[in-house]
Amino acid sequence: VQFLGVLLLATITIGLPVYWLYEPERQANATEGFENRFASWGSQLFDVTANGGFNCAGCHGGMNATGGAAEYTVTDSKTGQVKAVSWKAPALNTVFYRFSEDEVRFILEYGRPFSPMSPWGVRGGGPMNDQQINNLIYYLKSIQVPRENCIVADADPLNCDGGHLPASVQDDIQAAAERSVDDGTYSSIGEALFNLELGSGAYSCARCHTPGWSWGEPGETGAGAFGWNLTGGATNSHFATEQEMIDFIKAGSVYGAKYGVQGQGSGRMPGFGSTLTDDQIREIVNYVRSEL
């Protein structure tokens, strides 16, 4: 009996520390396993209808969500005329550069009114429960463009804090803007970036702030659509200085948080500080404040 007691004591004394030594790794591996499974289930939901999915891929540019188009009908508010259009569906492989997880969840649950983006969560009247929305979010996280210069050097570049688009992608954005100036489409880099079509408008301002831009029939630039009207010096009234406006565009709006002059965030305005360079944002601000 004494021997068994000593053996048990030795097992506890030696075994438990050894067990706890490996416990953090075990938990980390278990968490990674759950996340991978959730992402896999999310991919099935994201897939095209023919494969049993909800056709997110069909609109947003395939399983990597690089940007696509959705068939939609729009009604002219003045004439009542109805017509079919092809609506630019933005790339989602940078969506977490622009929005927080809570903001992405809100968009998935409630959709974007007056656009092809329907509500998908049961809270918004859609077909997906909370777990399915979570699975979609895990899948979207798994296809993000890897970030450069994360705050923590060895963090997962798909979902790390801080960081920005790879320099090569930012160079592509700049090159696309410069081409549209060189060919005479736009008169300045700021105007070109404001209207940038790369990624089906994922990096542009006009997608939300110019009526009709999303289906190729833009009205007055910056006159307001899903985003508010920027014309007539509106931004100069809302932001006392150029730097205030730059800081707002970099961070985006935060639900309930104040910004500018008597502004309160809705969470709908994405942050562009991780996708565009400081110089690119400054070009946009100069264009909006001086030309709209």
PLM region spans:
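Sequence context surrounding c-type heme c attachment/ligation sites in exported
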Residues: 40-57, 99, 191-206, 216-219, ...
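The canonical Cys-X-X-Cys-His
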Residues: 42, 51-63, 104, 136, ...
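Electrostatic cytochrome c docking/interface patches
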Residues: 22-50, 67, 157-201
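Extracytoplasmic electron-transfer domains, predominantly the class I c-type cytochrome c fold
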Residues: 73-143, 217-292
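Extracytoplasmic/periplasmic mature domains of Sec-exported, cell-envelope-associated bacterial proteins
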Residues: 37, 52-53, 63, 70-73, ...
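Inter-heme linker and motif-flanking segments adjacent to c-type heme-binding CXXCH motifs
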Residues: 65-69, 125, 142-152, 185-192, ...
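Hydrophobic membrane-insertion alpha-helices, especially the h-region
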Residues: 3-19
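Surface-exposed patches in mature extracellular/periplasmic domains of secreted proteins
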Residues: 54-58, 119-120, 146-155, 203-207
